[in-house]
């Protein structure tokens, strides 16, 4: 909360996000997460090594789940302290959530060897995400929403895999979010995404943040009349290590 206070007072912060990380729902479903003091958090043990255990998984309840309830309580405290600052929330995209439940190599094999169970897993991930949005709406009313789905980029999966295993569930997530919040979410997908821009716009995405490997002008010309476009600033070379002038130029 002190960081939010200083950002508001010193930089005029007009919004903050209290959301779920890429692995949070995986942890809520039973995967063992590890968050080192220095470094990126990771899944130490996936809960769904074998689909024989799938029926043991239940849609998460943000009010009762020990991984989710503290985040919701944190959001309440922050909103009480900063009632004048807009609050948003976020989840991970369907496939990115799935690999926090089941190892990525198995999920990718499932696209060919076990599509029926993979569809069930992806459906579960969306239901868990929508439950989070429902809880947030119940507590705070309509807020801005976003999802990050790095695994759905064209560097990891093919366009055919995207069409069958990612797009239908992104569409379900978007439609469900609209029904709950009254507005569509934004999204960020890392890496190469140009082959799926039109699909994302067709799915009803409100805004899309592209990675710095893609061309902002090309994205604007392709789909800028159908969804907002953002992003494209190199996060390390410019934002972390660049000068002020380089940040502005980028």
Give the positions of each predicted feature.
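Segments that shape or occlude catalytic/ligand-binding pockets
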Residues: 1-19, 23
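Active-site loop segments of alpha/beta catalytic cores
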Residues: 1-3, 14, 38-42, 60-250
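A contiguous, low-structure linker/loop signature
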Residues: 20-61, 77, 84
């Amino acid at each position: 909360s002190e960081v939010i206070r200083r950002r508001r007072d010193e930089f005029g912060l007009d919004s903050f996000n209290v959301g779920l990380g890429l692995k949070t729902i995986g942890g809520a479903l039973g995967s063992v997460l590890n968050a080192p003091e220095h470094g990126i958090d990771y899944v130490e043990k996936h809960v769904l090594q074998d689909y024989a255990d799938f029926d043991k998984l239940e849609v998460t309840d943000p009010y009762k789940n020990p991984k989710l309830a503290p985040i919701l309580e944190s959001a309440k405290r922050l909103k009480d302290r900063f009632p004048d600052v807009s609050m948003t929330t976020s989840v991970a995209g369907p496939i990115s959530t799935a690999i926090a439940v089941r190892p990525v190599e198995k999920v990718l094999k499932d696209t060919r060897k076990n599509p029926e169970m993979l569809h069930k897993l992806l459906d579960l991930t969306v239901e868990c995400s929508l439950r989070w949005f429902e809880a947030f709406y119940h507590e705070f009313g309509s807020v801005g929403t976003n999802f990050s789905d790095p695994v759905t980029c064209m560097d990891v999966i093919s366009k055919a895999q995207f069409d069958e295993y990612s797009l239908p569930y992104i569409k379900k997530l978007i439609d469900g979010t609209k029904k709950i919040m009254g507005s569509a979410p934004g999204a960020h997908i890392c890496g190469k995404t140009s082959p799926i821009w039109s699909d994302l716009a067709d799915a009803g995405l409100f805004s899309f943040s592209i990675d710095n490997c893609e061309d902002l002008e090309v994205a604007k010309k392709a789909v800028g009349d159908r969804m907002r476009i953002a992003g494209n600033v190199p996060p390390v070379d410019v934002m972390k290590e660049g000068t002020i002038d380089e940040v502005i130029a980028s």
